[in-house]
A protein has these predicted regions:
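N-terminal juxtamembrane/topogenic regions of multi-pass membrane proteins
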Residues: 1-5
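Zinc-dependent metalloendopeptidases
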Residues: 41-43, 68-70, 144, 168-171
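Active-site recognition of the HExxH zinc-binding catalytic motif
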Residues: 45, 145-162
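Post-HExxH zinc-binding segment in Zn-dependent metallohydrolases
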Residues: 160-173
Length: 173
């Protein structure tokens, strides 16, 4: 039996998605990372997991991940950052934070020229970027104190997305 995705209310196979020109799927290793490290994904029913995987893969494909003060952004980083965005936008059918073209990843807190400070994350509208400290993103998902950098910064990106005139404009009341 093949893998199926729930898309626009219909259950579609990977083959159907490919014929439609939609080729967003996660590798087994990427799915494993979600299963091991992402509680929201773990709690989803199977059909919703398939849709979540599709949306994570599409988010990764749509963004340029840029390393700062590190050699590269790993696949694990891409998957968990994308999962943060999709967790927040999962109830919206076509919201992928498209205004933010770049995801800039630092290993730890960084100096922000825009804010002249050392934040853990920010959304920089001028650079069209979501900027994150990897260390603090991971801490946000491992602690139970209610502080989650990934969701916090993706919420800023979502707010910006609602303001900018593009295909994802004006979806919030």
């Amino acid at each position: 039996m093949g893998v199926y995705y729930l898309l626009f209310g219909k259950l579609l196979s990977e083959g159907t998605l490919a014929r439609l020109g939609i080729s967003a799927s996660l590798s087994p290793a990427q799915k494993d990372r979600l299963s091991r490290h992402f509680r929201f994904y773990q709690l989803l029913p199977p059909k919703s997991k398939a849709l979540f995987e599709y949306r994570v893969a599409k988010f990764i494909r749509m963004k340029e991940f840029v390393p700062r003060n590190m050699t590269h952004v790993t696949e694990e980083m891409q998957v968990l950052i994308a999962a943060s965005a999709i967790q927040l936008t999962f109830g919206y059918p076509k919201v992928f934070l498209s205004y933010s073209r770049y995801v800039i990843v630092f290993p730890d807190q960084f100096f922000s020229n825009a804010g002249q400070r050392y934040p853990k994350g920010e959304v920089n509208p001028k650079a069209k970027a979501i900027v994150l400290s990897w260390k603090h993103l991971v801490e946000g998902y491992s602690k139970s104190d209610g502080v989650n950098l990934g969701l916090h910064e993706m919420a800023h990106a979502l707010q910006l997305e609602n303001i900018v005139m593009n295909d994802e404009y004006d979806f919030l009341d």
